[in-house]
């Protein structure tokens, strides 16, 4: 819950790399949750996890960041099905 008592959604992505801008995997389910919850969805990026005090980068509304051009999404195997699922 945030300071106003509203539910927030947090996805933690950790890496041994110190580079917070390094690409990471995000599942379709995680991406759909980010779309659904927008400003209440956060990605916590933990870098340099082998260090004594790994830094944590907090990103709110990753979908908004994409739309503003402040993030990018690489879709190497995106598949879409239109119409009714059988």
Feature map (PLM): residue ranges:
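Mg2+/Mn2+-dependent nuclease catalytic core
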Residues: 17-36
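Short acidic-glycine loop/turn motifs at beta-strand connectors
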Residues: 2-4, 50
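Residues immediately flanking
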Residues: 12-14, 28, 48
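Active-site lining segments that contact anionic ligands and/or coordinate catalytic metals
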Residues: 7, 21, 38-41
């Amino acid at each position: 819950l945030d300071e106003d008592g509203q539910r927030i959604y947090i996805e933690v992505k950790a890496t041994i790399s110190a580079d917070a801008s390094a690409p990471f995997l995000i599942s379709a389910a995680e991406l759909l949750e980010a779309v659904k919850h927008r400003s209440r969805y956060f990605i916590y990026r933990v870098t340099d996890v082998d260090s004594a005090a790994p830094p944590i980068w907090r990103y709110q509304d990753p979908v908004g960041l994409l739309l503003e051009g402040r993030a990018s999404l690489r879709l190497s195997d995106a598949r879409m099905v239109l119409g009714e699922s059988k």
